[in-house]
Design a protein with these regions (language model features):
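Short beta-strand/loop segments at the ligand-binding rim of alpha/beta enzyme cores
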Residues: 158-165
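Anion (oxyanion) recognition and catalysis
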Residues: 45, 71, 152-156, 186
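Conserved N-terminal subdomain of the carbohydrate kinase-like
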Residues: 50-133
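Active-site metal-binding loops of divalent metal-dependent hydrolases
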Residues: 12, 136, 165
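Conserved phosphate/ATP/ADP-binding segment of small-molecule kinases
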Residues: 157, 171-226
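Glycine-rich phosphate/adenosyl-contacting loop at the front of the ribokinase-like
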Residues: 1-76
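Structural motif
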Residues: 7-8, 130-132, 162, 193, ...
Length: 226
């Protein structure tokens, strides 16, 4: 493998998004590729970067379709594992009257949650310029421990770690548990991407600037993006 500009680690799943109502009056959903880290890999590839994706999907119609989408998007999938035991994670997206999204996940024993560190071909990190991940893989299963181990591996190699909080509380046992593990991840983060809502979840402050300054003073990021 040639050295990659960006290696993304995390969830690759199917988003079923609403596209209207059928003739029978039932909601119609469209199957779309999803998963924040996979989206980053695809977007970076479109900009001309060399990218690779580390993850796990089911060896099913969804997982094979997702792998094909990454390949067509010029994302290296040598470190994307296909599981014969676990199924690809599915998410159904609902939009409220303001257009804001909410998610219903079908992820119990999903393939992405069962990714083990020893399954990953670490050669994908050789010469890598940036490593990207998010908190979704930390919510449950084997992938929680794997997330921290791969972040530490990247840092050991001198690779800057980019972390997207991407908080999905309905995937976690509790908000307190989510905050605990996300704060652990921040200790391994060089570049942080966080929404305003996530920022106030992690840091108190009268406004965004104050909350961001407090969080940055605690972890000393190279960059903090809100």
């Amino acid at each position: 493998m040639s050295p990659f500009d960006v290696v993304s680690f995390g969830e690759l799943l199917v988003d079923f998004t609403p596209v209207g109502i059928s003739e029978n009056g039932n909601p119609v959903f469209e199957r779309n590729p999803g998963g924040g880290p996979a989206n980053v890999a695809c977007a970076a590839a479109k900009l001309g970067a060399g990218t690779a994706f580390i993850g796990k999907v089911g060896n099913d119609i969804f997982g094979n379709a997702l792998r094909g989408i990454l390949n067509r998007g010029k994302v290296n999938t040598d470190a994307l594992l296909l599981s014969d035991t676990y199924k690809t994670t599915l998410a159904f997206v609902q939009l409220d009257s303001f257009g804001d999204r909410s998610f219903s996940f079908y992820r119990k024993n999903g393939a992405d949650t069962m990714l083990e560190f020893d399954e990953i071909p670490l050669s994908v990190l050789d010469g890598c310029r940036y490593f990207f991940c998010s908190s979704v893989m930390m919510a449950e299963g084997e992938s929680r421990g794997t997330s921290f181990r791969i972040m530490k591996e990247a840092r050991k190699r001198g690779i800057p770690v980019m972390f997207d909080v991407n908080l999905r509380l309905n995937l976690w046992e509790s908000a307190a548990l989510a905050k605990k593990y996300i704060e652990e991840a921040l200790c391994l983060t060089d570049i942080l991407k966080v929404s305003e809502e996530e920022l106030f979840f992690l840091s108190d402050g009268a406004d965004v600037s104050e909350a961001a300054a407090k969080l940055n003073s605690q972890y000393n990021f190279k960059a903090l993006l809100v």
